[in-house]
Structures are given as structure tokens and as C-alpha cells.
């Protein structure tokens, strides 16, 4: 129904060397959680949705994104070609995936507390855990050592606050990604 959306997946598949559409449709949650798969899959899905919207006559006056989404936004804005975007994401995902293998990190969204309250709990937790993504005034994501993230999540649950562990392979947006940042330069 949307040939332009299909072309996004085909372009990504050609550059990455694996079938992105198959990955999105058939891979297990564990396989999709691997950074080397999840980042290109999210990128392809985001850009395919954008292309489908354009086909329907829906246009954007501006685009924005956070983290990986910044690359999709730059591509939608014409700052990166589709092919170059997938090349960049391939290298970003590779570097971050290598960091993920070298650590036991985790991330968890915390709802219903201010960033300051969340930071206070993280500071008191045993091990490394910090607030990393300030998504809204009432939702912050924490990241760090898996055990420390779990302990902090337990404190939040004890306070009656909702938490959601993210299905990711590392403590992204934390100091654990510094080797990836250095490699990606």
C-alpha cells in the first residue's frame, strides 16, 4: 500500500546486510533488543511511517527527535540521505552494541515523581544508577548497573510509583556508553 515505506526497509536492508522487515516482523523480543538490530529497525520504522504519511498528503513543517530519533528527523528534513542515515546508524549501533556486551546495564522508566525526587533515590541506591532521560515532568528514565536499577525500581514501587523496565541491552545515555562515544567520533 505504501511503496515509499517499503523502499525505506529495502534501502536499510541493502546497507545493513540483513532483512529489516523480516527482523521487525519475525525476530524474537530478545533478538530485537540487541542494539545492532533495534536501532536500524526503529530508524526504518520511523522513516517508513514518515514516508507513508507523505504519501497520504501529510507533511511536516518541522521535525524533531531524541537520541536515535534525531537521525530519523535529520533524514526526514533532508540533512542526511536515507543511505547515509543507515550507514551512520549501523556504526552507532555497532559501537553501542560493543559497549552493551561489556557491561550489565539496564534502564527503567519511572512515573509520577519529579526528576529531583528520582535523583535522590538514585543517589541513595547501592551501585551506579542515575536519571538519564527527562521525558516529561512526570516521567524520567534511569540507567545504570542492572542490580542498582532494579533496587531503585523497588524503592519507587514501595513509594507506590509505577515503573517500567525498558527492553534494552545496556545503560544507554550513561557513562557506560563513553567508549561508544569515543569510538563513534
Predicted regions and their residues:
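Helix-rich "cap/lid" substructures immediately adjacent to catalytic or cofactor-binding pockets
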Residues: 1-64, 142
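An amphipathic alpha-helix/helix-turn recognition signal
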Residues: 7, 41, 67-68, 80, ...
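Alpha/beta catalytic cores of group-transfer enzymes, especially the acyltransferase/condensing modules
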Residues: 14-18, 27-28, 77-185
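Gly/Ala-rich beta-loop-alpha elbow adjacent to hydrolase catalytic centers
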Residues: 46, 61-65, 69, 73, ...
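A short acidic, helix-capping loop that chelates divalent metal ions and anchors anionic groups
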Residues: 31-33, 72-75
Amino acid at each position: 500500500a505504501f511503496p515509499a515505506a517499503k523502499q525505506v526497509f529495502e534501502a536499510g536492508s541493502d546497507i545493513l546486510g540483513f532483512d529489516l522487515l523480516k527482523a521487525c516482523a519475525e525476530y524474537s523480543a530478545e533478538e530485537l533488543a540487541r542494539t545492532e538490530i533495534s536501532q536500524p529497525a526503529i530508524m526504518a520504522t520511523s522513516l517508513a511511517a514518515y514516508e507513508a504519511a507523505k504519501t497520504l498528503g501529510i507533511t511536516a513543517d518541522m521535525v524533531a527527535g531524541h537520541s536515535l530519533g534525531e537521525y530519523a528527523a535529520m533524514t526526514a528534513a533532508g540533512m542526511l540521505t536515507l543511505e547515509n542515515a543507515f550507514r551512520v546508524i549501523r556504526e552507532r549501533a555497532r559501537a553501542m552494541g560493543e559497549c552493551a556486551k561489556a557491561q550489565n546495564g539496564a534502564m527503567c522508566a519511572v512515573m509520577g515523581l519529579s526528576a529531583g525526587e528520582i535523583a535522590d533515590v538514585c543517589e541513595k541506591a547501592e551501585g551506579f544508577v542515575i536519571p538519564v532521560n527527562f521525558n516529561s515532568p512526570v516521567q524520567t528514565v534511569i540507567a545504570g548497573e542492572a542490580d542498582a536499577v532494579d533496587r531503585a525500581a523497588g524503592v519507587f514501587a514501595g513509594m507506590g510509583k509505577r515503573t517500567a523496565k525498558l527492553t534494552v541491552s545496556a545503560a544507554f545515555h550513561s557513562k557506560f556508553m563513553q567508549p561508544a562515544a569515543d569510538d563513534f567520533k
